[in-house]
Swiss-Prot record:
This is Complement factor B. The unliganded VWA domain has an inactive 'locked' conformation whereby the scissile Arg-259|Lys-260 bond is protected from proteolytic activation. Disulfide bonds join 37-76, 62-98, 103-145, 131-158, 165-205, 191-218, 478-596, 511-527, 599-615, 656-682, 695-725. It comes from Pongo pygmaeus. Cleaved by CFD following activation of the alternative complement system, generating Ba and Bb chains. Cleavage and activation takes place when CFB is already associated with complement C3b.
Amino acid sequence: MGSNLSPQLCLMPFILGLLSGGVTTTPLSLARSQGSCSLEGIEIKGGSFRLLQDGQALEYVCPSGFYPYPVQTRTCRSTGSWSTLQTQDQKTVKKAECRAIHCPRPHDFENGEYWPRSPYYNVSDEISFHCYDGYTLRGSANRTCQVNGRWSGQTAICDNGAGYCSNPGIPIGTRKVGSQYRLEDSVTYHCSRGLTLRGSQRRTCQEGGSWSGTEPSCQDSFMYDTPQEVAEAFLSSLTETIEGVDAEDGHGPGEQQKRKIVLDPSGSMNIYLVLDGSDSIGAGNFTGAKKCLVNLIEKVASYGVKPRYGLVTYATYPKIWVKVSEPDSSNADWVTKQLNEINYEDHKLKSGTNTKKALQAVYSMMSWPDDIPPEGWNRTRHVIILMTDGLHNMGGDPITVIDEIRDLLYIGKDRKNPREDYLDVYVFGVGPLVNQVNINALASKKDNEQHVFKVKDMENLEDVFFQMIDESQSLSLCGMVWEHRKGTDYHKQPWQAKISVTRPSKGHESCMGAVVSEYFVLTAAHCFTVDDKEHSIKVSVGGKKQDLEIEEVLFHPNYNINGKKEAGIPEFYDYDVALIKLKNKLNYRQTIRPICLPCTEGTTRALRLPPTTTCQQQKEELLPAQDIKALFVSEEEKKLTRKEVYIKNGDKKGSCERDAQYAPGYDKVKDISEVVTPRFLCTGGVSPYADPNTCRGDSGGPLIVHKRSRFIQVGVISWGVVDVCKNQKRQKQVPAHARDFHINLFQVLPWLKQKLQDEDLGFL
């Protein structure tokens, strides 16, 4: 800060197994055969290739809007030659090439017409559907050919309502056999040669008018699900399961409850995480899978969901790291620690791919001893999330274990109560070597839900988990951010507010603040004077240029910057906090979200503490008597940047506070407690690390503790000893006595509670 002491102005049971292709990107110009096959003559016209599995396979890569013809992948055979380039009708091709992606035409469309008709459709082409008289259109009347070779929208269906079940439709690219829709009637679907059917090949009309299974589609080898498609479909299905548990616990499945469910001690969810550690995955993908799972565990926990976890890795044999029966299996932090300690090398000596054995390990955790079911067994919902390429090479067909699990859970045995809601098997295929037939066979088939996905690589899979988790119903939860690499500054600091005060003939002052509710921004009192008018105060949030209208500024009643002038202290910053009340309610979005405040119910949930947690216990958790890692957010070159600091709250606290005497105007203060009251937190200095310092424009911003993937504000930036940002540039070399002082929010809680009493924050 300035040398004249001017003030400173950031669930349910899952089984997750991973088998991937072990991708190594290999630029064409640098390619070297790592296997026994030569790379000579394998180029693709208009594209490139990359080696997989240490040179034992390769993938052809084409620009967006194109696909590799006639195949996407080739394998190195034992004879030392690459697999033949063959078309879908078994014709041999001399050289691979990149061809433009087309969308398939409708083979059949019942009870209506579509236009225009063409043998194929180019990207961006549109088709329209309409029904004959007496039939009603369901689905999308207009559909567009997308760059991934799929049609936008939903299957168009013309139905007259005459059947017991509605017409299940004919997805574009498929053929349907069967046109009777009476109870127990069935229809079957088929794909053209070379395409793979995803979903249910056979569907049966069931009691209640619903169809068994899920809508099929025909997939080409080059087709991948986008991260957005996967996230939306998976989250939609996942929410159905959570809502079902919520309803059984006696709660209505309200919109705000979908991600706030805390399961009772008997537990109605288990999560089994199963990772493949075989040769086919590769060390890099194994690490990426762990990262995805850690993120999933953290985020599920951050919503207040406390399922029990099982953790298994496998190759030739499975290894159980965490059992759902263990006392700590519902402790997300403990499970994450166990996951992080697993190494890819743990299965190095036995590196086959035995998916069946892995699922049997899960079955063993689901089952009960002596064949006597425990009380409440039939209320536990099971979800299996399996990430695999479907290329199991030993142990037999894993689908038999899925059948055994269904039998154990009494699923599909009673026509009137099939209990399908109690088991969901999601299968994620990762990479180009995915066997689409095998992964489709393992996945659940449920009406209007998707359980099988194919993503291009581990990077796309990480995108899925980011997009899947940050859905709109969580926007009101405090201290949550979107940490994705594509996120903007305000995705990563959605609480941050910029404040500007314009004073005629005196210029303007810039400060920061934090969104704490839909109507209030918390900042520093010294950013304003009693003469400032509401219209002269500008507040912006979410990175938007449009300023918010101000209703009033509320100062802490004990704040008085001139309170000790008679004692020779020119500026006194005790109780330096203020609340800006907005005229209009904020609409939360990913770039505008509240930060957590101490001693609120939201912070109790964020810290995963028991509901009975007291304010004192929160304080002990957030501000223990030691050096505390914290952060603040500063603007540098028009970008928001997090600065990591340490709050000196242990043996370094005294020396940190004594350095206040180096501030201009405080050099003659005999008792430093006259200016550094118990309401201040101190950062800065060079021990235990050299802390960055705040600048003038950082005043009023939040001092934050980042814990358990949530951000909790513990202080408000107030003043500093040294102006480290002279001439609008942060100095790299600063003295050891460069300290910053922040108002401790735990010390002003009565005022916060009074002013924010109508904001539904649940102060303790």
